[in-house]
Structure formats: structure tokens, C-alpha cells
Amino acid sequence: MNQINNMKNTLYSLFLLLLSILPAYASGDKPTIKSLLKELDRTIAMKADFHKQREHEIDSIRKLAHATPSPEEKYHLYSSLYGIYLHYQADSALHYLEKRKALLPSLQNPQYENDLWIARAEVLGIMGLYNEVAAQLEQVRRDQLDNQTLLYYYYTCRTYYGWIADYTRTDERHKYIEKTNAYRDSILSLTTNQLDHSVVLADKMIVEGQADKAIELIDKELAGLDNQESLVYLLYNLSQAYAQKGDTEKQIYYLAQTAIADLKTAKREYISLQKLALLMFEKGDIERAYKYLSCSMEDAVACNARLRSVEVTEFFPIVDKVYKLKIEKEKQISRTLLISVSFLSF
């Protein structure tokens, strides 16, 4: 009973954290870009605190897993640890995947075996091991999957082919885009949750060049939304829709909110902050661009998220060079002013 209560307390803490991520929407007050960027700066400065909170949650679940004699309970607790580590520290997610696998002989549940193949593909994708992702997905027995696991399989396939399409420069890119679109449609055909359906449908609309329709759909969902986790996905989709429309200010507005949410939930594998960094650079805010990219690189390396590391390194050297030139220029101005003041004092 104590173990169950402890688990409830841990989950309740996670729930409270999610509720605190984007309080502006909960209260109905919309923040300004200026206030959001200031909050993002504070959030980056407090990143270590959010990581400590995450480690505390991990430690609580790990203790429960160690204490329970039930293989079934251990399996589900290891699944929770896998989920927490997935976008935080991919190597550790893989470690708890192996612990789940070790329990399979005592559980005798073929559904779990398929679930592990999909989960392994998911984490290997984050680590950038795409050849291995394909090999894992080929092992899945789709005829054995219930609807929930089949949906998980579709999401993983859609993400995998999306990654491949983004980083393929050959004639095969179109083939991967078609596969990405096909799996997105499969998700839409199977999803029963209205909010999840809207998130995926908005993504589809944006891909098909229907930004205005996507914005209209998302705005309807935001009107009465109380699911903070889904809110993050909707806001990111809004940023993409406004990017398609060429509205940079709105893109910054929504990327800032998703970046804050990513950092407050101790995610290290993310895309919003580096996209925001590039926009800051284009607007001439070199200091923020440098800060955001440095944070993104640090987190990607700590998570072992190779794709995100590659994304950052594509334009970090340019930002780094401009930032250092800016600092040097400021030093030169300071030295000139100091000399001038010293001269006038005589």
C-alpha cells in the first residue's frame, strides 16, 4: 500500500508540474513576446533545478521498482522509467528497456515483446541509429497488436520516416515523404481521442499547405483546453503554421512557449529552442541566439540525441563567430571610452 501511495505522490507531482508549464493559457491571459522571452531566459538559467526535480522523480520510481516482488509491477515501473528517460537521457532509456526485456520469460505476454521492439526503435531513432530502427520495426508482428500498441507503432513509423525524409538529399526523399504521410493517415484512422486527432490533423494540414485551416482547428481546441501536455503539441503546430504564412512574430511567440515547456519538463531532446535561436539570429539578437544554441547543444549531447546535435552544429559555428565578434567589438568600445575618460581627467 505504501508503494502505491508513493507512486501516486510521484504521479501527482508530475501532474502539478505540467499544470505549471503554461499558466497563461490556463488563466486566459496571453503573454507578450517580450515577457515570454524573459521567462525563457529565466527558465534556461533554472535548467539545473528542473533536472534535479526530474532526478528525484526517477529515484522515487526506481526505489518502487526495486522494492516490489511482482514481475508485472516491475515491468510497468521500468516502462515509466523508460518514458521519463526517453527525451532526457537516451542511454538510460535503453538500459530500462533491457530490464523490461529480461522480465519477458516470467510474464509470458507476446504483446509486451512487440511493445519492446517498437520502444527500441523509438529510442534508437532519438540516438540517430536509423539503420537499426528499421531492423527493429521489421520484427513487430502487427497481427498481434491491440489498437493502442498499433497506434504506438504507427507513431514510431511516422516519426522514423519523417527523420529519414528530412535528412535525405537523394531522389528517394519523395518515397520517404510518402511513407511519412501514409503513417500519419494511419494514425488519424485509428485515433479515437479527439484532441490527439486534432494535433495530428493540424500537422497534416500544415504539410499540405493549409496553414489557415490548421490555425482555425487549433484555435478551436485551445478555447476549452485543459490538457497541458497536448497544449505543447498544439502550440508547436501553431508555430509551424505561422512559419508557413511568413509571420515570424507569431512563430517566435509560439516557439517560445513550447521551448519553455520543454525545459520545465526537463526534456533534453527538442526542436523548438534551436528553431527559435535561428529566428533570434535573423532578428539580430545575437546574444539570445548564442544562449539558445549553447543550451540546445548541451542538452542534445547529454541526452545522446544525435539528430538534434547535428541540427545545432549546422549553424552554431556561424552564430558563435558573430557572437565572439560582437563581444570583441563591445570590449573595444569599452577600452576606447576608458581611454577617453582617462584623457579628459588630466
Functional labels for PLM-detected ranges:
Residues 4, 12-14, 23-331:
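A "functional boundary" signal
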